């Protein structure tokens, strides 16, 4: 079983009460000698642009902004920032940089903005007042610090090694307003991100902000609350709230209730809920759809179900060996101009089926046949007068396993559980991976007018990959050993290729690439022409790949077997490897795994190992 390992986050916060430090005296002078060494040396087959070093060991954060202009490395007590040439911009100790002497920071995280961003620090003090501070990443100057905000994380949280993965349950950054919502016991406070100034406070909204939508035209925010897991005792009397707020002064324009409980994913801690605005209506996706009037918050219609699809196995975090949950088992709603299609879950028989509802009134227009034996129904598509349904497929699994880890890989499990410790001991270690379960797998085509079954494929024995749909005419899909092409209008199978003849192992995923479909497999890649299914190439040079990324015009594969983290750059025209980078350290983006970060255009990879940073060019 392949896995994607993610070090659980150590994150951090902010507060109010603006203050300014005597920056010139407190900031360590950036050392000129730490300029990036130009290279030309090869990393795999990639070219190293430069190598440089942070002024600290970068045990907490080691990341780069979207275009590679700023490279940030932090430990518990200090930060070091390099420019795109690998030269030091600034270095400093938090205690000297902050007026409130924020020091050992249990949680730290970055928020990137165009041309810079913020570094947030949270110093949880078990016997004193918690301290928060915000630094300007471009200069190292303190923007503000505060001791006004308490109980943003549980008391006694331990400082753990980890990666920069986002914000706390009690703090939500609102990018459109460059501001933060900070949840306290009796109120929510909106804070200016640059100055720490309190803009407004309301006691009519309680809990954390699970999801929000900002209406720039009216300067209004619609947001939904949830109960922070680790701080639940602070939010007694909690109730579900969906509110519209005047972003200027915090006035509550309307307050509605909703059905269901917002859960957080086991490892990522993302809220499992979505919000969309369609015309004058707000659509909430939480165990089905709930639809509200945007003007007054009144519920108009709903189509919901009882959801236990996340599942749970193993034991509790206390005394057990593993806890596991499944996600992304049901497709999100599919919207058209006048209708919405929803994958529904049968209450008693656990069947799955599709409903079509009128977007305006919610009237049920049709319900498809009920499918038994399928654990998941992860994707639906509208192509012409057909609704294409993927029955079966891969699911996302998130796990916490009680394992022995070294001090360098003892990721911040305390952020989730409060447990964790030193090197060479057992800790709760997080994993995220895609997995195929034994279930019914097939392609199902429904008539859009009636919901009746137009055609279905034969049952796939092994598994079913996601679909590639080409020019609204053809559908391509794999089942592990075979690769198929279907005519969408009629369901005619116009080719059936023996993928196992490519000698690259079972199909795991499919990639849409120009006039080809590239099949990512257990031992390598195979590509097939869309026109006739003929094989273009097959390469088994890369084994154990369990994930792929399309970044800009570049494609990357990832291998995480045996606690490794290797990123391969791939030329999809011929399947050849451009180069590879194997992580030898911590930090990096959680998206790409320990020790690795990649720019938004996919042109550069940054590799981190303690103090050392290497910038690598993808295309020579």
Question: What do the predicted segments below correspond to?
Answer:
Residues 1-7:
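Bacterial N-terminal signal peptides that target proteins for export
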Residues 7-16:
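Bacterial N-terminal signal peptides
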Residues 17-21:
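Sec/Tat signal peptide C-region and signal peptidase I cleavage site
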Residues 22-620:
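Secretory-pathway ectodomains
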